[in-house]
Swiss-Prot record:
Polar residues: bias regions: 122-132
Lineage: Eukaryota, Fungi, Dikarya, Ascomycota, Pezizomycotina
Source organism of this protein record: Aspergillus fumigatus (strain ATCC MYA-4609 / CBS 101355 / FGSC A1100 / Af293)
Gene this chain is encoded by: has1
PROSITE patterns, per the entry: DEAD_ATP_HELICASE, HELICASE_ATP_BIND_1, HELICASE_CTER, Q_MOTIF
Name used for this protein in its record: ATP-dependent RNA helicase has1
Basic and acidic residues compositional bias, start-end: 51-63
Oligomer status and interactors: Associates in the nucleolus with the 60S and pre-60S ribosomal subunits.
Enzyme class, broadest EC rank: hydrolase
Length: 622
């Protein structure tokens, strides 16, 4: 038995001579990275412990004190020396994402000697032994929360000092370990509300990579997940805990490798998270202490209800704190809260006392515009506001693709963002627009939820939202934060003015804007000529036209957005056609009620007489 120990000792001595004081940290890091890969983690490393004990006894107190000095010095000097000496790789793969690896190693070195339980397996001490700061009253500033110095330094670097209302009311109970169901407007500061308590918990329990995942944040869209990840990166910059992101469209194998190395704070979209929970061997999540479900209503709206139920069922529920945030409270959200939260959660709603459902500082308007003038008005508006930062919302991916191709072709540069793009393209576009001082982004509702895009001047709703909730989330992309200003404009056709009544009931204040006819640039004839001559634009325009009609037919507010009231000739002109093109369109169940009307002699919009089933051929005129 003594032979192997001597060999290990001699190897360690050689490493020490070669690398200096960081050699032990490097070996410990290698051990920490590989450990979770072995059957979810329970590995006994007591022989290594005995070896360290013998070594320290043999070398005496002076040498161990000297060793601690070297370790602390290396952590104080900065990141570079640690990176050279084998500092642990950050979960997201960026070398600069963990700026305090040195502190991590010195903490691990000092902490391992005092807490054998932590090094012997992936298990953690019970959350019941956790002591997080308790706050009395309602604090106004982050410095009054009793947070760790590392967290406060990161918050200060981010430029925050005073808390928003949702932060004041949620962070103290979350630090106390309560389950919270929070409701707040978009742009109110929810992200820090759940990340600060999560990071404090990870730090207090001294999570290491080998302990696996302690916090999971579930987000409805990839872009929102990337945004939360960016905030987490800033918040964790002085902490030693690892963090990562798993989203659909990204490299699954690379994600699995990071999870096996150990990701303490994980941001994820539901589908990819469930995939890893079920199929990634070595993904340690038995130590999960906090589950955050952000934009819960949106997660359920986009069809992830089954996935969320499975995720909640798979994750350990004992000692788990759950935070569920939702801008709107629906029956489905209440059902999810019932299965995920512990009995007696704290319900926090910061909006119910407000006069309006949208943020202050937001000027909201609408314009009544015929279908054939909609594109001309949009073109004129964008031309006059080239120096502004604008987001334009459309109802379908094909509408976005067509208008992006058209506007870029006629030298009005725009960026596009929609669900049919590859993930890398979506990510690049999102960050390019975030960093831009001016420009136009045209997109579907994939960008309507939670995204914090700086300094947006105008939100244009070219196609109407499905309901007032979607309207609120769309306009929430501007006037974000304290004292911020922004403006929104919604295009409505004369047949759609009934939507204003629904907005009024939802406490959304809108006023009518007027655009003088002589200010609208009339490029209709040039547009029709271009669409008639350019094969690719013509094909794209047809797809956009077809998708627009499909989206319109599937509107939830059928009483307002009645597809039968559309003037197809005018709609077609808006897409650059002199006469409506002949297209095949599958409307599915959304028009099942129209079958009876057809049988009673009423033709569906633009359909040929005696058409069978739900396939309609468009005519030029009705």
């Amino acid at each position: 038995m003594s032979g192997p120990v001597d060999t290990a000792k001699s190897i360690t001595k050689k490493r020490k001579r070669k690398h200096g004081g960081g050699a032990r940290a490097a070996t410990e890091t290698d051990d920490a990275i590989t450990r979770p890969a072995i059957e979810n983690g329970a590995v006994n490393d007591s022989p290594e412990k005995e070896e360290d004990t013998k070594k320290s006894e043999k070398n005496g107190k002076d040498k161990s004190a000297k060793k601690r000095k070297v370790s602390h010095a290396s952590s104080d000097e900065g990141d570079e020396s640690q990176e050279e000496q084998g500092a642990p790789a950050q979960a997201d793969g960026d070398s600069d994402d963990n700026k305090d690896d040195g502190n991590d190693q010195s903490e691990a070195e000092n902490g391992d000697n005092g807490d054998k339980k932590d090094t012997e397996s992936t298990d953690l001490p019970s959350a019941g032994t956790l002591s997080l700061p308790t706050v009395e009253g309602e604090p106004q500033k982050f410095t009054e929360l009793g947070l760790s110095e590392k967290t406060l330094k990161a918050i200060n670097d981010m430029g925050f000092e005073t808390m928003t209302e949702i932060q004041r009311r949620t962070i103290p109970p979350l630090l106390a370990g309560r389950d919270v169901l929070g409701a707040a407007k978009t742009g109110s500061g929810k992200t820090l509300s759940f990340l600060i308590p999560a990071v404090e918990m990870l730090s207090a329990l001294r999570f290491k990579p080998r302990n696996g995942t302690g916090v999971i944040v579930v987000s409805p869209t990839r872009e929102l997940a990337l945004q939360i990840f960016g905030v987490a990166r800033e918040l964790c910059q002085y902490h030693s805990q690892t963090y990562g992101i798993v989203i659909g469209g990204a490299n699954r194998r690379a994600e699995a490798e990071k999870l096996m190395k150990g990701v303490n704070l994980l941001i994820a979209t539901p589908g990819r998270l469930l995939d890893h929970l079920q199929n990634t061997q070595g993904f340690v999540f038995k130590n999960l202490k906090t589950l955050v479900i952000d934009e819960a209503d949106r997660i359920l709206e986009v069809g992830f209800e089954d996935e969320m139920r499975q995720i909640v069922k798979i994750l350990p529920s004992e000692e788990r704190q759950t935070m569920l945030f939702s801008a709107t409270q629906t029956t489905k959200v209440e059902d999810l809260a019932r299965i995920s939260l512990r009995p007696g959660p704290l319900y926090i709603n910061v909006d119910h006392r407000k006069e309006h459902s949208t943020v202050e500082g937001l000027e909201q308007g609408y314009v009544i515009c015929e279908a054939d003038k909609r594109f001309l008005l949009l073109f004129s508006f964008l031309k006059r506001n080239l120096k502004k930062k604008i987001i334009v919302f459309f109802s379908s991916c094909n509408c976005v693709k067509y208008h992006a191709e058209l506007l870029n072709y006629i030298d009005l540069p725009v960026l596009e963002l929609h669900g049919k793009q590859k993930q890398q393209k979506r990510t690049n576009t999102f960050f390019e627009f975030c960093n831009a001082k001016q420009g136009t982004l045209i997109c579907t509702d994939v960008a309507a939820r939670g995204l914090d895009i700086p300094a947006v001047d105008w939100i244009i709703q070219f196609d109407p939202p499905d309901d007032p909730r979607d309207y609120i989330h769309r306009v929430g992309r501007t006037a974000r934060g304290t004292n911020a200003k922004g403006r929104s404009l919604m295009f409505l056709q004369p047949s759609e003015v009934g939507f204003l009544k629904h907005l009024k009931e939802a406490r959304v204040p809108v006023v009518e804007f007027e655009f003088p006819a002589n200010k609208i640039v009339n490029v209709q004839s040039q547009l029709e000529k271009l669409i008639g001559q350019n094969y690719y634009l013509n094909k794209s325009a047809k797809e956009g036209y077809r998708s627009y009609l499909q989206a319109y037919a599937s509107h939830s507010l059928r009483s307002v957005f009645d597809v039968h009231k559309l003037d197809l000739v005018k709609v077609a002109k808006g897409f650059g056609f002199s006469t409506p093109p002949r297209i095949d369109i599958q409307l599915g169940a959304s028009l099942s009620r129209d079958k009876k009307q057809q049988q009673q002699g009423r033709r569906s919009y633009g359909s040929q007489p005696h058409s069978k089933g739900l396939k309609f051929k468009r005519k030029h005129d009705d």
